[in-house]
Amino acid sequence: MNRARDELGAHMSIAGGLSLSLERGREVGCGAVQIFLKNQRQWAAKPLAADEVRQFRAARRAHAIRHVFAHSSYLINLGNPNPALWSQAVDAFTDELERAEALGLSCVVIHPGSHMGAGLEAGLARVTAALDESVARTAGYRVKVALENTAGAGNTIGRTFSELVALLERAARPERLGVCLDTCHLFAAGYDLRTPAGYRRAMAECDATVGRGRVLAFHLNDAKAPLGSGLDRHENIGRGLLGLTPFRLLLNDRRFTRVPKVLETPKEPEPSADLRNLAVLRRLRLRRRLGR
């Protein structure tokens, strides 16, 4: 398979300019690239310049990277019970959707957030209201929102498929929403993907709740922390507690062949870490894909 045309890739740095992320992706053979849209440690950022947009779109064509999407800033908590901080989060997320639309990205991945002790139901209500507001402000946009499953630590929302589907079902415009599944987070939340039976159970639950057609992206990460630990600790593919089996099963599951899958594994040493992890993943493919 032509590496520039498959659905595998990695999160890439935007240091020096958005378009450089795509050049970095090409250098390690990405067919998919995830980026931050701005410095993810800061709330404010200067508006996108028309030249930046043109350069980014030209670089994407030149490097033949099929799938490009974004991850939102980690500062954003759509479940914040504080009204002022909630409004700040909504404004920031709306800005990210606007940037993603200008760049022609497919979706923006976001952690649903934390209820910060207010309780799960209150948190779900706050996140739903935030998503509805951001989507309403970007009416007519093509870019989608991908809710990422969480590892389950503390007061985070989105640990289970049932929590994710609660957000999807309550949304005013559910057609703009989907999910991004992180393998490390699934394992940390208690989904044991290490056997074919465990993988089938998890994907069956996903299909029965969220629906496989709403899976917009995958984060492929091995795990440093034990099953059900709630700890978000990423490891290189095959070198953590998940092992290779979950990745082999996913990469040969034809239900998800066209869904982009990116690494969020340790980057050191660069770029050899990404090169190694992508090579491991590509070797796991079978000529005959598995499917149910």
Per-range role (PLM):
Residues 2-3, 23-30, 48-69, 96-104, ...:
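Acidic (Asp/Glu)-rich catalytic clusters
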Residues 157-165, 187-258, 272-275:
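Gly/Pro-rich active-site loop or hairpin
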Residues 78-178:
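Active-site acidic/histidine proton-transfer and metal-coordination neighborhood
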Residues 271-290:
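C-terminal helical cap(s) of enzyme catalytic domains, especially alpha/beta-barrels
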Residues 1-72, 76-98, 287-292:
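N-terminal pre-domain/capping segments
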Residues 31-36, 66-70, 177-183, 212-224:
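Non-cysteine beta-strand/loop elements that form the S-adenosyl-L-methionine
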Residues 25, 71, 89, 100, ...:
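Conserved, mostly hydrophobic/aromatic
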Residues 11-15, 38-40, 72-75, 113-115, ...:
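Active-site beta-loop-alpha junctions enriched in small/polar residues
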